[in-house]
Amino acid sequence: MNAAAEAEFNILLATDSYKVTHYKQYPPNTSKVYSYFECREKKTENSKVRKVKYEETVFYGLQYILNKYLKGKVVTKEKIQEAKEVYREHFQDDVFNERGWNYILEKYDGHLPIEVKAVPEGSVIPRGNVLFTVENTDPECYWLTNWIETILVQSWYPITVATNSREQKKILAKYLLETSGNLDGLEYKLHDFGYRGVSSQETAGIGASAHLVNFKGTDTVAGIALIKKYYGTKDPVPGYSVPAAEHSTITAWGKDHEKDAFEHIVTQFSSVPVSVVSDSYDIYNACEKIWGEDLRHLIVSRSTEAPLIIRPDSGNPLDTVLKVLDILGKKFPVTENSKGYKLLPPYLRVIQGDGVDINTLQEIVEGMKQKKWSIENVSFGSGGALLQKLTRDLLNCSFKCSYVVTNGLGVNVFKDPVADPNKRSKKGRLSLHRTPAGNFVTLEEGKGDLEEYGHDLLHTVFKNGKVTKSYSFDEVRKNAQLNIEQDVAPH
């Protein structure tokens, strides 16, 4: 985004319409509104509905929002004027809080008198715990806390992508360990194919970065710049890719020249891994005849560092992977690893990048295990399912007011709708703690002030227009590691 486009962002216009009218709705003499964000627990979910439980979430992406949209001088005379005009037309009435915004402009030079406290980025926290809190630091600006709910709750997206990606990593880790005895290459087992499947460039950057919290393979280039700009890494880049064919680079040779296309591409990329989509006409013929016979001599001469990666891209994902492995297993020398599972030679691998979501992934690796194929043989690509087939409802991401000060008196507030106990919200000032047993617990009603519970895991990350604490992407990744990764030392 260039500087001109960035300057156009107006926080006064980045809220739900109804919030423009809320400053008139709070009790008179309200001086503080304190709200919090959580991924609510579903206590009454029908267990048959959803295969994956999502019992814990990866907290990621707030740092990006704070830095891109909320820090610094975000209120100007021009932006107030612009908002005033838009809302006059939008509501057909003068409901806009011009006085309140002018106060922020004059008293704070357009910096937001808000404090945000949050759990460290990359933290893995069970559902139903507080993840961040927001409160006004100036009693005149009680209305500002929930004005910024809209933009802050958009953190649901990176949180959900990172969480779903990590749940898939758990599946891959479990089956890789069971079928090979180690976790080598785990971080390259799920590759991001989602750039074209998301709704915008910004979505691509945010979503790709969230997947890279857990993995290192991506074709969504937008994630790299976002991480470098808003998080930073010790490595030159946080994500990697390899040369790969698409259908056009095969079909452009004509139907009778698929072998020539394959030969040309593997020769062009002889010393690095290369992925070749092989289902333009007949995936099984391609594996058996072209790769297994006609071009076999070119494949067996490749090094371990530069395998051919055959990519099927149609049909039932499980059936296709098993049949491809079966054909390749008859055409190339297969060995048995220490766990008793079949392994293709190191110069040959398979990537399944079609129809992969968290449910089909589980089915494919389970099916492979049953047929005694090691997960070492394959990797996966996921696009729309990884970055777009997600909503705020998946983890029940919610922002609610829990504490207000009116007439100088603090009051613990909550909602508890009669028709849905899942929507009950927490009360009072909140803090997050670890019990001696290592479990997370959210304390309500300011009870975290008592020393017996240990220190609060929520840290101030934003105060009065300044980002006060930041996390590097390396820290985020370390926080989000699987327990199994810490237990199994890499070879």
From Swiss-Prot:
Residues engaged in binding diphosphate: R196, H247, R311
Protein name according to UniProt: Nicotinamide phosphoribosyltransferase
Lineage: Eukaryota, Metazoa, Chordata, Craniata, Vertebrata
Modified residues (N-acetylmethionine): M1
Pathway participation: Cofactor biosynthesis; NAD(+) biosynthesis; nicotinamide D-ribonucleotide from 5-phospho-alpha-D-ribose 1-diphosphate and nicotinamide: step 1/1
Pfam families listed in its UniProt record: NAMPT_N, NAPRTase
GO cellular component assignments: cell junction; cytoplasm; cytosol; extracellular space; mitochondrial matrix; nuclear speck
Keyword match DNA repair: no
A GO biological process held by the record: NADP biosynthetic process
Natural source organism: Mus musculus (Mouse)
Residues the record lists as binding beta-nicotinamide D-ribonucleotide: D219, R311, P312, D313, G353, D354, G384, R392
Enzyme Commission number: 2.4.2.12
Coiled coil is among the record's keywords: no
Disulfides per UniProt: none
